[in-house]
């Protein structure tokens, strides 16, 4: 049986514009991304507290005691995630866990060490509840920027893989650590990690997906920041990487900078043309 060819995703990270009804016209934003040319919508960022409860950005509680509570704050969020994939270009909805903030992945490590990853553990309950409440959710982006605990990250990755999620690491440094994460998770549950979001901006400025970031058959999707590049420049950068090592996807950081001004479609087109 032949291994299926890797799928390339053109992704866009965004925070409040995907859910914050008091600040944004959410139906308009959802429609903009749905028909933008992006194939992956990455909602950022899931915080994990010491009890294991999940929330977006300290302002949108998602789970409490292993139960989905998102409807109390934004009752249309689950339906909006489904709409993203309904009739346009978006094929994958991903939630990103962690950030440069200290704590989220440290809490995951502590919880895995204390409770394991079985059905009775809080993290298992959380991510099972999240998947059930938001069936459109396909993948989890692992944005660990300060914990780097291999055993617990692998256990957590395999756990969410068994719950039906794909895993997409989101590194900006320490390639060898992330190569171990990818190989160990896929060794235990083949196919779980099916892409890598490589940060080539901010702390990862200067990263090159063609140099030092080889994950074997798992494709690397480099990301750039709109503050650094116009759409035409993004296309040129992606085309250079595509010519150098055959990248098949990439992503933009961050939708919050260019909501509703037409740039979403221009950036998606730039990446899509660059990686062909």
Identify the role of each PLM range.
Residues 2-240, 244-245, 253-274:
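Chitinase-like catalytic core of GlcNAc-active glycosidases
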């Amino acid at each position: 049986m032949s291994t299926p060819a890797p799928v390339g995703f053109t992704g866009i990270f965004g925070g409040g514009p995907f859910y914050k009804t008091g600040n944004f016209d959410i139906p308009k934003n959802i429609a903009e991304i749905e028909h933008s040319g992006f194939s992956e919508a990455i909602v950022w960022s899931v915080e994990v507290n010491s009890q294991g409860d999940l929330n977006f950005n300290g302002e949108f509680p998602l789970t409490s005691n292993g139960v989905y509570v998102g409807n109390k704050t934004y009752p249309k969020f689950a339906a909006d995630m489904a709409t993203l994939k309904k009739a346009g270009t978006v094929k994958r909805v991903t939630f990103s866990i962690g950030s440069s903030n200290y704590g989220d992945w440290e809490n995951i490590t502590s919880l895995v060490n204390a409770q394991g990853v079985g059905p009775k553990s809080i993290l298992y309950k959380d991510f099972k509840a999240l998947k059930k409440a938001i069936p459109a959710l396909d993948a989890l982006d692992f944005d660990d920027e300060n914990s780097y605990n291999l055993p617990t990250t692998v256990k957590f990755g395999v756990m969410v893989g068994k719950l039906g999620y794909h895993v997409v690491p989101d590194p900006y440094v320490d390639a060898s650590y992330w190569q171990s994460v990818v190989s160990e998770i896929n060794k235990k549950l083949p196919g779980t990690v099916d892409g890598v979001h490589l940060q080539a901006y901010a702390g990862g400025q200067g990263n090159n997906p063609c140099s030092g970031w080889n994950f074997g058959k798992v494709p690397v999707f480099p990301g750039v920041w709109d503050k650094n590049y116009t759409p035409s420049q993004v296309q040129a950068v992606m085309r250079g990487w595509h010519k150098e090592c055959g990248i098949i996807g990439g992503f933009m950081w961050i939708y919050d900078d260019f909501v509703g001004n037409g740039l979403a479609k221009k950036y998606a087109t730039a990446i899509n043309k660059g990686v062909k």
